[in-house]
Swiss-Prot record:
Region span, Disordered: 1-82
Membrane topology recorded in Swiss-Prot or TrEMBL: Peripheral membrane protein
Localization annotation: Late endosome membrane; Lysosome membrane
Example of a GO biological process term: response to bacterium
Disulfide bonds: none
Membrane-binding amphipathic helix: region residues: 131-151
Alphabetical list of PROSITE patterns matching this protein: LITAF
Protein known as: Cell death-inducing p53-target protein 1 homolog
Organism per entry: Dictyostelium discoideum
GO cellular-component term (any): lysosomal membrane
Pfam families, per database record: zf-LITAF-like
Ranges where the LITAF domain occurs: 90-177
Length: 181
Protein backbone atom coordinates (compact mmCIF):
# COMPACT_ATOMS: atom_id res chain seq x y z
CA UNK A 1 0.00 0.00 0.00
CA UNK A 2 2.96 2.32 0.29
CA UNK A 3 3.07 2.55 -3.45
CA UNK A 4 -0.13 4.59 -3.62
CA UNK A 5 1.91 7.82 -3.30
CA UNK A 6 4.00 7.11 -6.42
CA UNK A 7 3.75 9.76 -9.10
CA UNK A 8 2.22 8.09 -12.16
CA UNK A 9 3.38 10.89 -14.51
CA UNK A 10 6.50 9.20 -15.92
CA UNK A 11 8.27 10.08 -19.12
CA UNK A 12 10.97 7.71 -20.40
CA UNK A 13 10.96 5.88 -17.06
CA UNK A 14 11.81 9.04 -15.09
CA UNK A 15 9.30 10.63 -12.72
CA UNK A 16 8.31 14.08 -13.94
CA UNK A 17 8.13 17.15 -11.77
CA UNK A 18 4.74 18.06 -10.33
CA UNK A 19 2.73 20.65 -12.28
CA UNK A 20 3.02 23.20 -9.45
CA UNK A 21 6.79 23.45 -9.90
CA UNK A 22 6.37 24.05 -13.64
CA UNK A 23 3.96 26.91 -12.98
CA UNK A 24 6.37 28.54 -10.55
CA UNK A 25 9.15 28.56 -13.17
CA UNK A 26 6.97 30.41 -15.71
CA UNK A 27 7.89 34.08 -15.95
CA UNK A 28 5.55 36.85 -16.98
CA UNK A 29 6.60 39.86 -19.09
CA UNK A 30 6.82 43.25 -17.34
CA UNK A 31 3.70 45.38 -17.19
CA UNK A 32 3.00 47.44 -20.31
CA UNK A 33 4.02 44.63 -22.67
CA UNK A 34 1.58 42.15 -24.16
CA UNK A 35 1.96 38.60 -22.96
CA UNK A 36 3.47 36.31 -25.58
CA UNK A 37 2.01 32.85 -25.80
CA UNK A 38 4.66 30.25 -24.98
CA UNK A 39 4.39 26.59 -25.78
CA UNK A 40 6.16 23.87 -23.79
CA UNK A 41 9.10 22.35 -25.71
CA UNK A 42 8.68 18.84 -27.04
CA UNK A 43 10.85 16.09 -25.59
CA UNK A 44 14.17 15.71 -27.37
CA UNK A 45 14.17 19.20 -28.93
CA UNK A 46 15.80 22.33 -27.47
CA UNK A 47 13.43 25.30 -27.01
CA UNK A 48 13.22 27.68 -29.94
CA UNK A 49 13.99 31.37 -29.63
CA UNK A 50 11.26 33.47 -31.26
CA UNK A 51 12.09 36.97 -32.54
CA UNK A 52 10.67 39.80 -30.41
CA UNK A 53 7.59 41.59 -31.66
CA UNK A 54 8.25 44.80 -33.58
CA UNK A 55 7.90 47.93 -31.53
CA UNK A 56 9.00 46.29 -28.28
CA UNK A 57 12.56 45.96 -26.95
CA UNK A 58 13.99 42.40 -26.99
CA UNK A 59 13.53 40.52 -23.73
CA UNK A 60 16.28 38.54 -22.04
CA UNK A 61 15.24 35.16 -20.68
CA UNK A 62 17.35 33.25 -18.14
CA UNK A 63 18.89 30.00 -19.44
CA UNK A 64 16.73 26.96 -18.76
CA UNK A 65 18.16 24.12 -16.77
CA UNK A 66 19.06 20.95 -18.59
CA UNK A 67 19.73 22.59 -21.96
CA UNK A 68 23.07 23.95 -23.17
CA UNK A 69 23.09 27.71 -23.71
CA UNK A 70 23.71 28.81 -27.29
CA UNK A 71 26.81 30.87 -27.97
CA UNK A 72 26.44 34.09 -29.99
CA UNK A 73 28.05 33.99 -33.44
CA UNK A 74 31.72 34.86 -33.39
CA UNK A 75 32.72 38.12 -35.04
CA UNK A 76 36.03 38.34 -36.82
CA UNK A 77 38.07 41.55 -37.11
CA UNK A 78 38.48 43.12 -40.53
CA UNK A 79 41.73 42.33 -42.37
CA UNK A 80 44.58 44.78 -41.93
CA UNK A 81 44.46 47.57 -44.50
CA UNK A 82 40.77 47.07 -45.26
CA UNK A 83 38.52 50.12 -44.94
CA UNK A 84 36.51 50.20 -41.73
CA UNK A 85 33.56 52.07 -43.25
CA UNK A 86 30.24 50.25 -43.63
CA UNK A 87 29.14 49.39 -47.15
CA UNK A 88 26.24 51.52 -48.35
CA UNK A 89 24.47 50.18 -51.42
CA UNK A 90 23.33 52.94 -53.75
CA UNK A 91 20.28 52.51 -55.87
CA UNK A 92 20.17 54.36 -59.15
CA UNK A 93 16.75 55.79 -59.92
CA UNK A 94 15.80 56.21 -63.55
CA UNK A 95 13.15 58.85 -64.15
CA UNK A 96 11.24 58.46 -67.36
CA UNK A 97 8.92 61.27 -68.33
CA UNK A 98 5.66 60.14 -69.81
CA UNK A 99 3.81 62.80 -71.72
CA UNK A 100 0.09 62.32 -72.11
CA UNK A 101 -1.39 64.11 -75.07
CA UNK A 102 -4.18 66.42 -73.84
CA UNK A 103 -7.76 66.11 -74.97
CA UNK A 104 -8.48 68.49 -77.82
CA UNK A 105 -11.70 70.41 -77.45
CA UNK A 106 -13.04 73.91 -78.01
CA UNK A 107 -10.16 75.82 -76.37
CA UNK A 108 -6.44 75.88 -77.32
CA UNK A 109 -4.30 73.27 -75.53
CA UNK A 110 -0.60 72.97 -74.68
CA UNK A 111 0.93 69.97 -76.45
CA UNK A 112 3.91 68.69 -78.40
CA UNK A 113 3.52 68.93 -82.16
CA UNK A 114 3.70 65.52 -83.82
CA UNK A 115 5.25 67.08 -86.93
CA UNK A 116 7.94 69.48 -85.65
CA UNK A 117 8.28 68.02 -82.07
CA UNK A 118 8.06 71.43 -80.38
CA UNK A 119 6.08 72.19 -77.26
CA UNK A 120 3.54 74.92 -77.93
CA UNK A 121 -0.04 76.08 -77.54
CA UNK A 122 -2.33 75.30 -80.46
CA UNK A 123 -4.02 77.94 -82.60
CA UNK A 124 -7.73 77.29 -83.04
CA UNK A 125 -9.93 78.17 -86.00
CA UNK A 126 -13.59 77.44 -86.72
CA UNK A 127 -14.69 75.45 -89.79
CA UNK A 128 -18.20 74.57 -90.91
CA UNK A 129 -18.92 70.96 -90.11
CA UNK A 130 -21.75 68.50 -89.81
CA UNK A 131 -23.52 70.37 -86.96
CA UNK A 132 -23.81 73.55 -89.07
CA UNK A 133 -25.26 71.63 -92.03
CA UNK A 134 -27.72 69.74 -89.81
CA UNK A 135 -29.11 72.96 -88.30
CA UNK A 136 -29.31 74.51 -91.80
CA UNK A 137 -31.34 71.54 -93.12
CA UNK A 138 -33.64 71.62 -90.06
CA UNK A 139 -34.32 75.34 -90.63
CA UNK A 140 -35.21 74.67 -94.28
CA UNK A 141 -37.61 71.88 -93.22
CA UNK A 142 -39.33 74.22 -90.75
CA UNK A 143 -39.84 76.87 -93.44
CA UNK A 144 -36.84 79.18 -93.00
CA UNK A 145 -35.63 78.87 -96.54
CA UNK A 146 -35.31 82.60 -97.46
CA UNK A 147 -31.81 83.19 -96.09
CA UNK A 148 -32.58 82.34 -92.48
CA UNK A 149 -31.22 78.87 -93.09
CA UNK A 150 -27.76 80.45 -93.55
CA UNK A 151 -27.59 81.79 -89.97
CA UNK A 152 -25.83 78.64 -88.57
CA UNK A 153 -22.83 79.35 -90.83
CA UNK A 154 -22.13 82.53 -88.83
CA UNK A 155 -22.35 80.95 -85.36
CA UNK A 156 -18.95 79.71 -84.09
CA UNK A 157 -20.48 77.60 -81.33
CA UNK A 158 -21.99 75.32 -84.03
CA UNK A 159 -18.76 75.01 -86.05
CA UNK A 160 -16.01 72.41 -85.70
CA UNK A 161 -12.75 73.54 -84.06
CA UNK A 162 -9.48 72.99 -85.92
CA UNK A 163 -6.23 72.91 -83.88
CA UNK A 164 -3.01 73.95 -85.68
CA UNK A 165 0.62 74.05 -84.56
CA UNK A 166 1.71 77.62 -83.86
CA UNK A 167 5.20 76.90 -85.32
CA UNK A 168 4.77 74.72 -88.40
CA UNK A 169 1.08 75.64 -89.04
CA UNK A 170 0.07 72.00 -89.70
CA UNK A 171 -3.34 70.72 -88.56
CA UNK A 172 -3.02 68.61 -85.40
CA UNK A 173 -6.67 67.83 -84.70
CA UNK A 174 -10.21 68.71 -85.71
CA UNK A 175 -12.83 68.71 -82.94
CA UNK A 176 -16.18 67.62 -84.39
CA UNK A 177 -19.15 69.25 -82.60
CA UNK A 178 -21.57 66.59 -83.82
CA UNK A 179 -19.73 63.61 -82.31
CA UNK A 180 -18.03 65.49 -79.44
CA UNK A 181 -14.65 64.04 -80.46
Amino acid sequence: MGQDNINLNKVDGQPSSPPQEQQQQQQYPPQGYPQQQQYPPQQGYPPQQYPPQQGYPPQQYPPQQGYPQQQPPQQYPAPVGAPQQPYMATQQVVVQQVYVQPTFGVVPVDCICQHCQTRMSTKTSYKSGSMVWLVCVLLIIFGCWLGCCLIPFGIDSLKDVQHKCSHCKKVLYRFDRMSGK
